[in-house]
């Protein structure tokens, strides 16, 4: 799953519109829309706000796949 797809899935899973989510993370809905479309990548501060909002780590938020055995 790509990062934009993951953002869309997370938001829809909460039953939120882009216009409802954006104020919680301190950006405009138009800026958020560019992230879901894959047109732009969010700044670190926005990634942190999104991770906090969804209760995820940054790795979970950006769909980072750890190599097998890396957690050992």
In which residue ranges do the predicted regions lie?
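Short alpha-helical elements of helix-turn-helix
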Residues: 3-5, 29, 44-47
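Short, charged recognition helix plus adjacent turn
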Residues: 13, 34, 52, 62-72
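Recognition helix of helix-turn-helix/homeodomain-like DNA-binding domains
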Residues: 26-41
């Amino acid at each position: 799953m790509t990062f934009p797809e993951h953002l869309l899935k997370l938001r829809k899973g909460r039953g939120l519109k882009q216009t409802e989510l954006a104020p919680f993370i301190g950006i405009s809905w138009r800026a958020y829309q560019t992230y879901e479309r894959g047109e732009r990548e969010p700044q670190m501060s926005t990634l942190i706000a999104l991770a906090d909002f969804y209760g995820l780590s940054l790795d979970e938020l950006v769909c980072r796949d750890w190599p097998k055995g890396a957690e050992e």
